[in-house]
Each structure stands twice: as C-alpha cells, then as structure tokens.
C-alpha cells in the first residue's frame, strides 16, 4: 500500500487558481466518499482551507492512484487536467508522510508554528473517519500526526514568539506592564490591522479597550466584537488622557497624533508612563513625542526587529520539530511495512496455539490426577515457552518485510513453517492497471 497526497497550496498556486478548488462544508463528505470509490483508492481524507486543498489517499498502485486522484479533481470541479496540473504538488511514500506531519505541526504554514492548521487537520480526519473513508493506514497516520503536532508545540517554544507586527505590539505592551487587565488601552484605526490588534489585546486579557477611527461606525463595529468603546478620532485628546497604552495603525498620509497632543496630555497626566506603539506606514505619531517625559515610543522598525528575531527563533524551534518528524516517519514506516505480514504472524501464532492446546489436551488425558491449579500452572508455562520460541521468527518476518527481497524471504518463511497463507503472485506495484478493480475488493477488506 502507498500513501499519496495530491494538492495545491499558497506556495504552488495563486489564489485565483486555489479558489477554484475549494470544497464547501456541505460537499466535502460526498467528495471524500466519491474519491474513495475511485480505482485503486482505498482510503481518503480531504483537507480544504483558505491556503490549501489537499487530497490524501491510500492506493495499491502509485501510477493509478495519482492518475485517478487528479481525474477526480478534474471531474469534481469540471475542469481539464491540463488546466491545473502545473499547479499541483504530488508527494508519495515518505515525502507524503513528512508533508502531513509538517502541515499538522504548522511548519508548512505562512506563519511558521501557527496552530490553527492542527484543528483543521483534526476536523478533516474526524469527518473522514466518521463517514468511513479512512481505514487501518490513515487511522494510524492521522492520529500520529495530531499527537506529534501537539507534542511539538508543548515541547518547544515555536508558538510563543510573536511573528506579526500587531502581535509583536501586544507582546511589547505585556513586557512593559505584565498584566493588561487593569490597563486603559487605546487602538487608533479600525482597518484590518486595527481589528487584529484589538483581537490580540483582547486575547491577552485587556478588558478596557477604546477604538478610535475617522469613521466612528467602523470603530463601533470593531469595538463591539471585543466589548470595547468606540470614538471618533477627533476625540483622541481625551483618549490620551486616560490611556496607559496606545497602538496606532491608520492609513493616514500624515501624523494623526502630534507632539502638542501628547505634550498637553502628559502635562495633565503628571507625566504618568504612556506606551505609544506606532505600527503605521507612514507613521501616525510624531516621532518627536519620544522626547517627552514618561513617553515610551516604538515604531514599526522597532517591532520588525522583534518579529525578525522571533522568526529566527521559530526557525531554530522548527529544526527541533523536524527531528521529531524524522523519528515519527521512521516509526510509522516500520509499522507500515509490517502491516502486510500481520496475517502471517497471526497464522504462526494460531498454529502455535493449536500445538499448545493439543499438547495440553494430551497431558490432561494421560495425567488425569492433575488439579485445576496444576493445569493452570502448566498452561501458563507452556504459553511462556511458545511466546519465547515465537519471538525470533516474528522479529525475522517483520525485518524481512522491509528488505528489497521481501517476497522471497516471506515465501521461504511460509514454506519453512508450513503456514496456510497465500502470497500474491507478483508485487502490487507490478499489477497491470486493468487488474486493479478485481484486486480491490479483497485488499479493501484487509485495509478495513
């Protein structure tokens, strides 16, 4: 069995292409079921987010698995394969496993180390599992991916460092004041950056947030989401009087907070500390205010230094996660290659159990004076002997499954132990495409 992922993401395709391959919440279940019914495909999970659409499949033949997954995309979205093939990313085997582990851990995201994708992968997997499109392989693989991602975030500091200017501004405020719950916070600007800043402040514990904007209705729309207050920017002088922290991010062409505004406020505030963070370009705050007593001014360049430093630190943490991924891949592949010899191991154990039972029956017949306790002790020791005798053969067959001449070794093993297990006449990868349908039914039963 082979694992294949076919998809496109923000690295391989522009948004104009990606938006054509978005699965809605209502259709994604039908899509996974339909994908699983394609030729040579035994399991399927579809991950569809704003930045990626990826189809994960378990297939018995790489070439047919790739082809029918691409054909499924073409048919589902009513497109010609040639239109989107240049934008596709196709990974197989170890690289497919590595890709899933990296995606789930946030290493393939636009913001390295973000955790939103972990929830999206979990949702996609649980949805597929609920509707029966996963089996033995993906049930194991996706659980391993989720467990690995959780461990990666708890064992490293990859998610603890701000890597956006707005989040860095909030981190800076926390470093200065430790707790934000009792601080008066002013956000100037109600655009995308202003709203994100307000969100970050709210999540950091700020409870007294005032949003100022040229259009008061826009300020209200943002403030209402986070239990804040809305004001026109014309009232900024009043905002400066109360503020402990002010973060500004308007799109104005010139400063909206002048030297005189801050100087007057500080005089009335008796020079109480005021943290001003200007994340606008052009700058919103006159840089001369930094000379005023009690004023601490930071601009976007100061924050970019923090962001770049944190990005470098995240990359160091990412290397630690990559090492964990290498270990997880090795463990999973070891499990995967032994999956095919599970019926052989089961047959060997069953044969040994039959011998044990026959021997025990013979002993009981010949030694009819044995008590129930005697029989229990003898049975326990016989089982221990059998388990010890089976250890080396089972280790051998597991190792044999991973060798280049696996089929020869497995055939010799079956013959040596006289097991009643059938091997395919040829490796699955060599089966002709026309034979895939007939082979699918028994293989699918095994994978379930």
From Swiss-Prot:
<feature type="binding site">
    <location>
        <begin position="189"/>
        <end position="194"/>
    </location>
    <ligand>
        <name>NADP(+)</name>
    </ligand>
</feature>
<comment type="function">
    <text>Catalyzes the NADPH-dependent reduction of glutamyl-tRNA(Glu) to glutamate 1-semialdehyde (GSA).</text>
</comment>
<dbReference type="Pfam" id="PF01488">
    <property type="entry name" value="Shikimate_DH"/>
</dbReference>
<dbReference type="GO" id="GO:0050661">
    <property type="term" value="F:NADP binding"/>
</dbReference>
<dbReference type="InterPro" id="IPR018214">
    <property type="entry name" value="GluRdtase_CS"/>
</dbReference>
<feature type="region of interest" description="Disordered">
    <location>
        <begin position="427"/>
        <end position="448"/>
    </location>
</feature>
<comment type="similarity">
    <text>Belongs to the glutamyl-tRNA reductase family.</text>
</comment>
<dbReference type="GO" id="GO:0019353">
    <property type="term" value="P:protoporphyrinogen IX biosynthetic process from glutamate"/>
</dbReference>
<dbReference type="Pfam" id="PF00745">
    <property type="entry name" value="GlutR_dimer"/>
</dbReference>
<feature type="active site" description="Nucleophile">
    <location>
        <position position="50"/>
    </location>
</feature>
<feature type="binding site">
    <location>
        <position position="120"/>
    </location>
    <ligand>
        <name>substrate</name>
    </ligand>
</feature>
<dbReference type="InterPro" id="IPR015895">
    <property type="entry name" value="4pyrrol_synth_GluRdtase_N"/>
</dbReference>
<keyword id="KW-0627">Porphyrin biosynthesis</keyword>
<dbReference type="GO" id="GO:0008883">
    <property type="term" value="F:glutamyl-tRNA reductase activity"/>
</dbReference>
<dbReference type="InterPro" id="IPR015896">
    <property type="entry name" value="4pyrrol_synth_GluRdtase_dimer"/>
</dbReference>
<comment type="pathway">
    <text>Porphyrin-containing compound metabolism; protoporphyrin-IX biosynthesis; 5-aminolevulinate from L-glutamyl-tRNA(Glu): step 1/2.</text>
</comment>
<comment type="subunit">
    <text>Homodimer.</text>
</comment>
<dbReference type="InterPro" id="IPR006151">
    <property type="entry name" value="Shikm_DH/Glu-tRNA_Rdtase"/>
</dbReference>
<protein>
    <recommendedName>
        <fullName>Glutamyl-tRNA reductase</fullName>
        <ecNumber>1.2.1.70</ecNumber>
    </recommendedName>
</protein>
<dbReference type="InterPro" id="IPR036343">
    <property type="entry name" value="GluRdtase_N_sf"/>
</dbReference>
<dbReference type="InterPro" id="IPR036453">
    <property type="entry name" value="GluRdtase_dimer_dom_sf"/>
</dbReference>
<dbReference type="InterPro" id="IPR000343">
    <property type="entry name" value="4pyrrol_synth_GluRdtase"/>
</dbReference>
<dbReference type="InterPro" id="IPR036291">
    <property type="entry name" value="NAD(P)-bd_dom_sf"/>
</dbReference>
<feature type="binding site">
    <location>
        <begin position="114"/>
        <end position="116"/>
    </location>
    <ligand>
        <name>substrate</name>
    </ligand>
</feature>
<feature type="site" description="Important for activity">
    <location>
        <position position="99"/>
    </location>
</feature>
<feature type="binding site">
    <location>
        <begin position="49"/>
        <end position="52"/>
    </location>
    <ligand>
        <name>substrate</name>
    </ligand>
</feature>
<feature type="binding site">
    <location>
        <position position="109"/>
    </location>
    <ligand>
        <name>substrate</name>
    </ligand>
</feature>
<keyword id="KW-0560">Oxidoreductase</keyword>
<keyword id="KW-0521">NADP</keyword>
<dbReference type="Pfam" id="PF05201">
    <property type="entry name" value="GlutR_N"/>
</dbReference>
